[in-house]
Amino acid sequence: MSIEVVNESGIDVAEGELVSVARFAIAAMDVHPAAELSMMLVDLAAMADLHMRWMDLPGPTDVMSFPMDELEPGGRPDAPEPGPSMLGDIVLCPQFAAEQAEAAGHSLAHELALLTVHGVLHLLGYDHAEPEEEREMFALQNQLLQDWYEQQAQLYRDSRLLDKSRNFDE
């Protein structure tokens, strides 16, 4: 799976975490492992321009998704035909996300991880225009994010055990 991140926002973010959470969400949704994703981080002005151009809504927003190929969950690698190769583009605005994070009382890193999962789900056809769609999408988004955090915690614990084991062997 190829995930490219381009940061034109002027804000330093942990790009590796964005790739990790995107990769996790894509795999958890059974998207073909050959799928490609592009992520771009932009400033408020660029996001406001995209928001007006594509959604006809004024002002910036936190995340926008631009699907390329029609993908659906369940595109297992053992399927008879390979899935499409380009999942699409996710555009994030870290400055807008920072304001949301502060209002919600959590870190920018958490907000960007949440928005990355949100963007992946939009690329897969999930929406939140109707109340039932919103409940389904947000529940799935929260579960994926929680599962990713649990995976990260386990990886950290495993690496600490490995470090202790190496020190013991020396």
From Swiss-Prot:
Subcellular location: Cytoplasm
Broad class of where this protein is predominantly found: cytoplasm
Presence of keyword Heme: no
Molecular function per GO: metalloendopeptidase activity; RNA endonuclease activity; zinc ion binding
Cofactor note text: Binds 1 zinc ion.
GO biological processes: rRNA processing
Function text: Single strand-specific metallo-endoribonuclease involved in late-stage 70S ribosome quality control and in maturation of the 3' terminus of the 16S rRNA.
UniProt similarity note: Belongs to the endoribonuclease YbeY family.
Official protein name in the record: Endoribonuclease YbeY
